[in-house]
């Protein structure tokens, strides 16, 4: 991507993902040089160009995977998690892939985009955005992007403070309406 630094304000960015949610847009710089398989997976699912074997968040067998998905787990001061088409925390695309850890990417600041998983090599479609430093996650979750502007960070913060039930699920759904990649 030409001159991506001026677009994303991140020297690591290879593309930008904009999550259009019912609470506002979240712009994220994607780190394709540091986590190429993870970024390719996310972009492919977002655009509907990557095959998957489960129903997407809209209930279909093909097309953009994340459109209509909710942030199903929100923990104030920690993170917001989405990307599960079922909204339960147990769904995914029907496949798993390996972690990609890069020494330049550490959970040493908020607003990092990373893969949610159930242990080594179990990445699929679920992701989270941190709202604080989370060094205990280093080498456990693949970091593949960062929220890049103050307005997007405010949206993430607002989502992180939304009311939740006893299972950390927002009582008023936070919906990913669509994702655009540029």
UniProtKB/Swiss-Prot annotation:
<dbReference type="InterPro" id="IPR029000">
    <property type="entry name" value="Cyclophilin-like_dom_sf"/>
</dbReference>
<keyword id="KW-0963">Cytoplasm</keyword>
<protein>
    <recommendedName>
        <fullName>Peptidyl-prolyl cis-trans isomerase A</fullName>
        <ecNumber>5.2.1.8</ecNumber>
    </recommendedName>
</protein>
<dbReference type="InterPro" id="IPR002130">
    <property type="entry name" value="Cyclophilin-type_PPIase_dom"/>
</dbReference>
<keyword id="KW-0413">Isomerase</keyword>
<dbReference type="GO" id="GO:0003755">
    <property type="term" value="F:peptidyl-prolyl cis-trans isomerase activity"/>
</dbReference>
<dbReference type="Pfam" id="PF00160">
    <property type="entry name" value="Pro_isomerase"/>
</dbReference>
<comment type="function">
    <text>PPIases accelerate the folding of proteins. It catalyzes the cis-trans isomerization of proline imidic peptide bonds in oligopeptides.</text>
</comment>
<dbReference type="InterPro" id="IPR024936">
    <property type="entry name" value="Cyclophilin-type_PPIase"/>
</dbReference>
<dbReference type="GO" id="GO:0005829">
    <property type="term" value="C:cytosol"/>
</dbReference>
<dbReference type="GO" id="GO:0010039">
    <property type="term" value="P:response to iron ion"/>
</dbReference>
<dbReference type="InterPro" id="IPR020892">
    <property type="entry name" value="Cyclophilin-type_PPIase_CS"/>
</dbReference>
<dbReference type="GO" id="GO:0005886">
    <property type="term" value="C:plasma membrane"/>
</dbReference>
<comment type="similarity">
    <text>Belongs to the cyclophilin-type PPIase family.</text>
</comment>
<dbReference type="GO" id="GO:0006457">
    <property type="term" value="P:protein folding"/>
</dbReference>
<dbReference type="GO" id="GO:0009274">
    <property type="term" value="C:peptidoglycan-based cell wall"/>
</dbReference>
<comment type="subunit">
    <text>Homodimer.</text>
</comment>
<keyword id="KW-0697">Rotamase</keyword>
<dbReference type="InterPro" id="IPR044666">
    <property type="entry name" value="Cyclophilin_A-like"/>
</dbReference>
<dbReference type="GO" id="GO:0005576">
    <property type="term" value="C:extracellular region"/>
</dbReference>
<feature type="domain" description="PPIase cyclophilin-type">
    <location>
        <begin position="13"/>
        <end position="181"/>
    </location>
</feature>
